[in-house]
């Protein structure tokens, strides 16, 4: 009963915040005003708070532009998490437009929709992503092309990395920076989340969106770690397959280390640089002391 009361309250609060911010965002998109880039970040921070997503950030977002972020994909929650951390736009499948709730949110965030089955439109879509990169927008790409179980990185597809190549001629420095990042669901209710419980956070796609959303609302208190890795410079001499291989290697390493409780810096014997969007969350060391 208490869980359903929480679901209802969270839903009402999120609707109220949306009714305030959405008309402003629509106006900013229509008039091409600067707040269109950062307003979604505030909405997503509220959404993460209400859903019980506690986000910790490790490392730093690369300050150089153009910047393409390449991340592993576990769930629709990844969108909320990354959007609460930085002012980003996403590359999404065209059918996301028709999703309840999230389709509208994707359009309001000015996502780039691609039709992967329509090969003849691929060039136009890649050029659109390249133009957005050249305009200074931070574009997020999920190169796996689907969601995983949260325990591993699936094979990544190289085709959309062509967006980096298309933005190279428009870059003032002739370089596009491709930064890997890993999204790891590591805790639930303050306790470490093992492989067995990670499906609570993951959305593999064979479960309906609305039932999974309600399940997350009932559960709450999920801990998420976002690790930013070292960027790869993509210039006119770069090999797309080699860049995608290197990016995949770095994402896989960060994800594996985080799920095993090791940070990249700790593995190198360096202090771990971490900033938290939720300062009340215990550190990895504190949680390990609390764990049975």
Swiss-Prot record:
It is an enzyme of class 2 (transferase). Keywords: Acyltransferase, Lipid biosynthesis, Lipid metabolism, Membrane, Transferase, Transmembrane, Transmembrane helix. Pathway: Lipid metabolism. Its EC number is 2.3.1.270. It is found in: Membrane. It catalyses: a lyso-ornithine lipid + a fatty acyl-[ACP] = an N(2)-[(3R)-3-(acyloxy)acyl]-L-ornithine lipid + holo-[ACP]. Belongs to the 1-acyl-sn-glycerol-3-phosphate acyltransferase family. OlsA subfamily. Catalyzes the second step in the formation of ornithine lipids, which are phosphorus-free membrane lipids. Uses acyl-acyl carrier protein (acyl-AcpP) as an acyl donor and converts lyso-ornithine lipid (LOL) into ornithine lipid (OL). This is Lyso-ornithine lipid O-acyltransferase.
């Amino acid at each position: 009963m208490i869980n359903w009361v929480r679901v209802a309250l969270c839903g009402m609060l999120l609707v109220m915040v949306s009714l305030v911010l959405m008309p402003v965002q629509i106006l900013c998109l229509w008039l091409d005003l600067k707040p269109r880039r950062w307003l979604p970040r505030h909405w997503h921070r509220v959404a993460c708070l209400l859903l019980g997503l506690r986000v910790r950030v490790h490392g730093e977002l690369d300050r150089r532009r153009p910047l393409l972020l390449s991340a592993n994909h576990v769930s629709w929650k990844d969108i909320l998490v990354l959007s609460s951390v930085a002012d980003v736009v996403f590359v999404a499948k065209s059918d996301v437009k028709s999703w309840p709730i999230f389709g509208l949110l994707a359009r309001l965030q000015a996502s780039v929709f691609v039709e992967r089955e329509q090969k003849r439109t691929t060039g136009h879509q890649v050029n659109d992503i390249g133009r957005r990169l050249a305009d200074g927008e931070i574009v997020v790409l999920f190169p796996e092309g689907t969601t995983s179980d949260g325990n591993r990185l699936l094979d990544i597809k190289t085709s959309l990395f062509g967006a980096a190549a298309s933005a190279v001629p428009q870059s003032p420095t002739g370089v596009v920076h491709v930064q890997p990042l890993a999204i790891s669901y590591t805790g639930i209710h303050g306790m470490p989340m093992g492989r067995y419980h990670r499906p609570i956070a993951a959305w593999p796609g064979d479960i309906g969106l609305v039932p999974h959303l309600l399940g997350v609302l009932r559960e709450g208190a999920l801990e998420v770690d976002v690790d930013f890795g070292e960027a790869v410079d993509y210039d006119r001499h770069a090999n797309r397959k080699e860049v995608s291989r290197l990016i995949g290697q770095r994402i896989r390493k960060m994800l594996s280390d985080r799920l095993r409780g090791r940070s990249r810096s700790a593995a190198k014997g360096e202090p771990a640089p971490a900033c938290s969007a939720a300062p009340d969350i215990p550190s990895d060391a504190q949680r390990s002391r609390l764990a049975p």
